[in-house]
UniProtKB/Swiss-Prot annotation:
This is Serine hydroxymethyltransferase. PANTHER family: SERINE HYDROXYMETHYLTRANSFERASE, SERINE HYDROXYMETHYLTRANSFERASE 1. Its EC number is 2.1.2.1. Its cofactor is pyridoxal 5'-phosphate. NCBIfam families: PRK00011.1. The keyword Cytoplasm applies. Belongs to the SHMT family. The record marks H241 as: Plays an important role in substrate specificity. It catalyses: (6R)-5,10-methylene-5,6,7,8-tetrahydrofolate + glycine + H2O = (6S)-5,6,7,8-tetrahydrofolate + L-serine.
């Protein structure tokens, strides 16, 4: 074998056989460090979870290599036989899981799934309604910095000051005044049940389409731990990586066949090209997992754990926005402690408790500082925490916050060190990817 042939052989051997550590030590180190972070810290970000080994395996599968523009049976590329199998399974499982007639499993993200609905139903400048960001809504529901607020005319509804619940009478009055073409229910930081029947009643009154973005609660809906938006919503969207415990992606669900062509055309070719088939495969895996009886147990445990965490926080002197939670999440108002959400996020992270700063209703601080933090129980529940563990977590959070209230943003180093030790002990009892 010549030198050139040997060199080429060595190159090909590396290509086919080198693992990540050999091919890219820097990225391998970052992945290893991220795994250790997830193992050693308690994840309390409400929008995060821990996917199964099977979901990770599908996400990293050879479907990464496959282009599959179009839909099953109607592709623009050859060689899509097994891509069709994967996508058809994902569609059928999604329909079974959520009790609907149609599903599009191609959206690459939550933003793109909602953009596809806008593209299918609205023209630039059309009016739609969504929950105000300061009341727990999402960027894609009309924030002025998002395409939904730049290309369309968003009108917001919010929560009452006295009880921090959505005022359905205000929703109805706003809808009658502005006559939106689309009404969105669903949010990213609202911990109470949504009145889906009333939203549909209001939508029908003003001849609007009702979209439910159930990204945060879809796992709870799938597991019977939260009311379903069907049959009330015309269209339902959801990410798949939050309480549903799948890969990072999105789906669109509906019942009316008349919506099929505009929604499918909006996703492809309107918004996307080839779908991420490795992610579609992982979605199919996650849907199958969610169809199992043990997932129902998990979903109910998420809600039970959230209530235990909220109760513990209140018992330890922290106020929960709206007085509690009906789902997986809660907002903690730190105003009385004179602690910012930014400081709390940093202090809790030093204590190995991961959360995110979050605005509270009628917050006077900027979104980069905030007066609150958002907490959630999906990831902790996945690793095996029950109510007893979450009550301990609530007490640990309160200790750190009290240290911040006493000493300012630098916190109480001794308290944070003590909390780290107890977090480490908890995590060792409930390992991640052991």
């Amino acid at each position: 074998m010549s030198t050139a042939e040997q060199t080429q052989s060595d190159i090909m051997h590396r290509f086919w056989h080198d693992d990540l550590a050999a091919a890219d030590p820097e990225i391998a180190e970052a992945v290893s460090n991220e795994l250790k972070r997830q193992q050693d810290k308690i994840e309390l970000i409400a929008s995060e979870n821990i996917a199964s080994k099977a979901v990770l395996e599908a996400t990293g599968s050879v479907f990464t290599n496959k282009y599959a523009e179009g839909y099953p049976g109607k592709r623009y590329y050859g060689g899509c036989d097994y891509a069709d199998v994967v996508e058809t399974l994902a569609i059928e499982r999604a329909k079974e899981l959520f009790g609907c007639n149609f599903a599009n499993v191609q959206p690459n993200s939550g933003s793109q799934m909602n953009q596809a609905v806008f593209l299918a139903l609205l023209q630039p400048g059309d009016t739609f309604m969504g929950l105000d960001l300061n009341s727990g809504g999402h960027l894609t529901h009309g924030s002025p910095v998002n395409i939904s607020g730049k290309w369309f005319n968003p009108v917001s509804y919010g929560v009452r000051k006295d009880d921090e619940l959505i005022d359905m009478d205000e929703v109805a009055e706003t809808a009658r005044e502005h006559k939106p073409k689309l009404i969105i229910c669903g949010g990213t930081a609202y911990s109470r049940l949504w009145d889906f029947p009333r939203f549909r009643e209001i939508a029908d009154e003003v001849d609007a389409t009702l979209l439910c973005d159930m990204s945060h609660i879809s796992g709870l809906v799938a597991g019977g731990a939260h009311p379903s938006p069907f049959p009330h919503a015309h269209i339902v969207t959801s990410t798949t990586h939050k309480s549903l415990r799948g890969p990072r992606s999105g789906i669109i669900l509906w019942n009316d066949e008349d919506l099929t062509k505009p929604l499918n055309m909006a996703v492809f070719p309107g918004l996307q090209g080839g779908p991420l088939m490795h992610v579609v495969a992982a979605k199919a895996v996650a849907f199958r997992e969610a169809l199992r009886p043990d997932f129902r147990t998990y979903a109910h445990a998420v809600v039970e754990n959230a209530r235990a965490l909220a109760a513990s926080l209140e018992e330890n002197g922290l106020r929960i926005v709206s007085g509690g939670t009906d789902n997986h999440s809660m907002l903690v108002d730190l105003t009385a402690k004179d602690v910012t959400g930014k400081a709390a996020e940093a202090g809790l992270d030093r204590a190995w408790l991961t959360c995110n700063k979050n605005g509270i209703p009628y917050d006077t601080r900027s979104p980069f500082v905030t007066s609150g933090i958002r907490l959630g129980t999906p990831a902790g529940t996945t690793r095996g925490f029950g109510p007893a563990e979450f009550r301990k977590v609530g007490a640990l959070i309160a200790e750190v916050v009290d240290g911040l209230a006493k000493n300012g943003p630098e916190g109480d180093a001794q308290v944070e060190e003590s909390v780290r030790g107890r977090v480490s002990e908890l995590c060792s009892q409930f390992p991640v990817y052991p």
